[in-house]
Amino acid sequence: MYISLTDLFKIGIGPSSSHTVGPMRAARRFLMELPDGMLSQIARVRVELFGSLAHTGQGHGTDVAIQLGFCGELPDEVDTASIAGRIATIAREQSISLLGQKSVRFQPLLDIRYNLKDLLPLHSNAMTFRAYGAFSDEAATTTPIAERTLYSIGGGFIVDEDEAFVGSPRGGEATMPYPFASMAELLVHGKRERLPLMDLLRANEHALRGTAATTSFLDRVIDTFFTCIDRGIATRGELPGGLNVKRRAPDIHHQLTVERGQRRIAPHKVLDWVSVYAIAVNEENAAGGRVVTAPTNGAAGVVPAVLRYARDFCDVEPEGLHDFLLVASAVGALCKMNASISGAEVGCQGEVGSAAAMAAAGLAAALGASNEQIENAAEIALEHHLGMTCDPAAGLVQVPCIERNGIGAIKAVAAASLALRGDGSHFMPLDNCIEAMRQTGEEMSTKFKETSLGGLAVNLPEC
């Protein structure tokens, strides 16, 4: 199945695509796909979380996301300002309205179970949903009338045990003008047709949904990216979760704005702008704000930061921003198809590493790079994230995640710049680097795969 722009760039809420966006969609899907008439028979729903969802779900807001999903909410539509009040009401009344149609008894502390011992075979991020019938005997509710296991495999994608791939087939994919499963195949298309990568990818997207819909979606993603940055640099205070992490983006942005009028500014200060854009996005994400998976929430700041840099400092026009995202989405799709974008599966190399590769390729494309230079930019960025662990402090998407996005964005700019200094010839193909990421992730201990059982997560300072 072709992974398109709309698959990769999902508008949703923070703090995690795999632990928030995915579980919300999964809870809703469980109820939506029940047999006709069964919803009215339900007296209670429960969910059991496994693996990384169990270990860090509370810090990532998985419990909140599941309750919203049971209520029928979607990540791109839910009113973020209403979430806290709705969750408080559910806890107080011990009742939840399934899809807004059927109220049943629900106790979050009892009906959301965190299984810290067992792992299911398909993926670490597993959820087993159970619905129980309207029996008068409480003991009888131990036998569910419906049960289904769903997996949140990164970037907001969800899959059940019977699906070979995520999502529903769109149909007509055999007529995709330029199908590809590797960068090598994409480069062959470009060489044969004498077209830049963005034109190939634009043709694919147009074949899926038409020119107007593709352009509209790209504009919506860009607007959401930049709105998130603007909101992040304007919002002060502490982030939720208990680590008492202070938002830094507003102060950094103020300092940079003041310094802009000064004559003697060190050239490297432009990197501070790139960094503050990324930090702003990830502080918004940590606070549960509206973000876009790029390719995940944990790495949501890299692509918009470099995109904003392209607009503000490189004078890239709107069409160039579209080119940026088209190319970035292809690189992200390859990382997902041939390795993983899930921190619970391959560590942070799959999240910030993939995001940096996407951003580097996108920036190179927007600045007029050849197809080979674009591939080189992506490979450089990904190569220098290989082996990066996912070990969030207290299970929150804050430390080291927020700063890591800033550094990842800077590395993406450096990778694109370095690639543009060459002629496109390079030693390591992107496809091989992605395979190295997959192999590295397979060998990585589960302590470093979004479980908060190792690394920085167990070496916090004593306060």
Task: Please name every model-derived segment.
Residues 42-57, 89-96, 252, 326-338, ...:
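Short, mixed-charge aromatic SLiMs
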Residues 75-262:
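C-terminal regulatory domains involved in ligand/effector binding and gene-expression control
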Residues 327, 333-406, 418-427:
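Hydrophobic alpha-helical bundle architecture
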Residues 427-463:
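Extended hydrophobic packing segments that form well-structured cores
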Residues 2, 6, 10-13, 24-49, ...:
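Non-transmembrane, aqueous-exposed alpha-helical and coiled segments at domain scale
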Residues 9-27, 286-306, 348-356:
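Conserved phosphate/anionic-ligand binding catalytic regions in large, soluble enzymes, centered on
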Residues 211-343, 347, 456-463:
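Accessory "access/gating" subregions that flank catalytic or transport cores
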Residues 20-35, 304-315, 360-368:
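Alpha-helical support elements that line or immediately flank enzyme active sites
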